[in-house]
Amino acid sequence: EWCGSNADCGDGQCCTGGSFNRHCQSLADDGTPCQKPNDYNEYKFGCPCKEGLICSPINYCQKK
């Protein structure tokens, strides 16, 4: 589903992608690729991790 910002997506999702190809995607799960949370809530490659997980230095979710 196309989105302009995270507000266009449901709970547990973020808006990710390039400027013309943005879509809602589920928050990243343990062991899956992620993008670290940022102040602007702008994500190009993936979503932040689900609650209780952190995005590791190699951009994969893992338990805290």
From Swiss-Prot:
Protein's name in the database: U9-ctenitoxin-Pr1a
UniProt entry tagged with the keyword Disulfide bond: yes
Any single Gene Ontology cellular-component annotation: extracellular region
Disulfide bonding pattern of the chain: C3-C15, C9-C24, C14-C47, C34-C55, C49-C61
Function comment: Non-toxic to mice and insects.
Tissue spec: Expressed by the venom gland.
Disulfide bond is among the record's keywords: yes
Cellular localization per UniProt: Secreted
Family per similarity comment: Belongs to the u-CNTX family.
Alphabetical keyword list: Disulfide bond, Secreted
Gene3D superfamilies, per database record: Lipase, subunit A
